[in-house]
Amino acid sequence: MGSVSNQQFAGGCAKAAEKAPEEAPPDAARAADEPQLLHGAGICKWFNVRMGFGFLSMTARAGVALDPPVDVFVHQSKLHMEGFRSLKEGEAVEFTFKKSAKGLESIRVTGPGGVFCIGSERRPKGKNMQKRRSKGDRCYNCGGLDHHAKECKLPPQPKKCHFCQSINHMVASCPLKAQQGPSSQGKPAYFREEEEEIHSPALLPEAQN
């Protein structure tokens, strides 16, 4: 009995020894799951400064020229540069990238030889409210430049000339406006709407008294 058990134990050890080399080391299995980084070079095809992303036109991969070029996605967070990160259209770049379910995505983007990217001279534009106020619009209720009458926090103010802010006359008889002539007639429609709201009895209940 003992000799049979020893033989079975020895046989089991031999089979285990045969199976052991088939199992891959943990590090090798992990490396196989990670995406392989590839090297490319080319130019910036286009880049949206406001959204912070664009596409590279890869003209060479691992030193081998590509014809036609291949598009590679780029996000501003991957750009090697200081300050505001962006790319200029046609700017020469070198980069590492990977293959993903969405396509080719850049991992790190630099200028030729690993230098900083040049970037675009463009900067994101301000909000529409800032652009609107930069044209010299003012509140027709209090005369403030930082808001419109619809946004004014003050109660309805006494009627006054909306051109020179004088309370001695209305805009129709303003001498300063008359001196400017027809140039003052090109007032946008929303200016007239706000004037009508300021003059309306709903906003000026004291006018009914």
Curated annotation (Swiss-Prot):
Any GO MF annotation of the entry: translation initiation factor binding
Coiled coil: none
Modified residues annotated as Phosphoserine in this record: 3, 120, 200
Manganese in keyword set: no
SUPFAM superfamilies the record matches: Nucleic acid-binding proteins, Retrovirus zinc finger-like domains
InterPro entries in alphabetical order: CSD, CSP_DNA-bd, Lin-28_RNA-binding, Lin-28A-like_Znf-CCHC_2, NA-bd_OB-fold, Znf_CCHC, Znf_CCHC_sf
Location in or out of the cell: Cytoplasm; Rough endoplasmic reticulum; Cytoplasm, P-body; Cytoplasm, Stress granule
Result of altering residue 119 to R: Erroneous subcellular location. No positive effect on terminal myogenic differentiation
Domain of life: Eukaryota
GO CC, any one term: cytosol
Residue ranges of domain CSD in the record: 39-112
CCHC-type zinc finger span: 137-154, 159-176
One Pfam family matching this protein: CSD
N-acetylglycine modification, residue list: 2
Result for mutant: residue 85 to Q: Erroneous subcellular location. No positive effect on terminal myogenic differentiation
Keywords: Acetylation, Cytoplasm, Endoplasmic reticulum, Metal-binding, Nucleus, Phosphoprotein, Repeat, RNA-binding, RNA-mediated gene silencing, Zinc, Zinc-finger
GO biological process: cellular response to glucose stimulus; germ cell development; miRNA catabolic process; miRNA metabolic process; negative regulation of glial cell differentiation; negative regulation of pre-miRNA processing; negative regulation of translation; positive regulation of cell proliferation involved in kidney development
Other comments on record: Reactivation of LIN28A expression enhances tissue repair in some adult tissues by reprogramming cellular bioenergetics. Improves hair regrowth by promoting anagen in hair follicle and accelerates regrowth of cartilage, bone and mesenchyme after ear and digit injuries.
Domain notes: The CSD domain is required for function in muscle differentiation. The CCHC zinc fingers interact with the GGAG motif at the 3' end of let-7 miRNAs precursors, more generally they bind the 5'-NGNNG-3' consensus motif with micromolar affinity. The CSD domain recognizes the loop at the 5' end. The flexible linker allows accommodating variable sequences and lengths among let-7 family members.
Name of the protein this chain belongs to: Protein lin-28 homolog A
Source organism of this protein record: Mus musculus (Mouse)
Lineage: Eukaryota, Metazoa, Chordata, Craniata, Vertebrata
